[in-house]
Amino acid sequence: LPKLGENEVYRCIKAVDLAPVLGSLGGLQWTRAGQTGKYPCDVVIKKALPREIMALIEGLDLGGTLARAVLRRLAPRQDIPPHVDDWMPAEADWRRFQVPLVTHPDVVMRWPDDGVSVHLEPGFLYEVRYDRTHEVVHGADCERIHLQIDQVNATI
């Protein structure tokens, strides 16, 4: 698939079997992350991801090079405020993918300037725009755990 078009902010790419990875979530060592002025959340970065998660990433066949992978956990009802991820190098062909692992229909990803709101369902691979204003509105009483993958020169 080509990268997202100018008028697209997300795309559901394919189904993903989560069974091999869900059991590995319980024993993870989460780290509190968040810079001044940014939202705090719990993360597990690439070097600490269990082999089950790394195998899932490899099995997605994204092509290109894995630049960054992180599990991001939000507490119940914890939102991510509107922001643009502008820290990625402009000269690289970065694409962002999300695999929701634990979520709820009341957790919505929004691109307010584009008028798009969507619940990213677990068990699917999505490509999402990070270079437009986006946010997460978390209206549920459960955690939200997503695998976020930044890939350079992806060919999927």
Set out the residue ranges of the language-model regions.
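Conserved short histidine dyad/triad with adjacent acidic residue
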Residues: 70-91
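Short, surface-exposed charged micro-motifs
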Residues: 70, 98, 135
